């Protein structure tokens, strides 16, 4: 599963995320970063909501309560800032239909081939 961490101080947050083992998460890989946006591949059986909850708890426990950050999923190769909106509605929104993508299926496929 791909999630996106957006934070100015993402290196410290990634350090905190990666220094623990999590039940249900086999591995965490960094695909790429674009400015403060870090695209992560999570090898897991957990859903997006539980991954985010787990990571936020871990960051909070390690002193990250003062950090400003957010996690997002991906929809139609774009960062899904509107997770609360139905997929049917998203399919009508210009943002999700633009040709400029945040993480293409090809980029993800190429990354997964490299990790195997």
Task: Mark where each language-model region is.
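Short proline/glycine- and acidic-rich turn/helix-capping motifs at secondary-structure junctions
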Residues: 33-38, 68-86
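Short, intrinsically disordered low-complexity segments
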Residues: 27-63
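Short, low-complexity S/T/E/D/G/P-rich linear segments that nucleate or cap local secondary structure
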Residues: 102-116
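Short amphipathic alpha-helix segments
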Residues: 5-26
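Short, low-order "capping/linker" segments at domain edges
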Residues: 77-100, 111
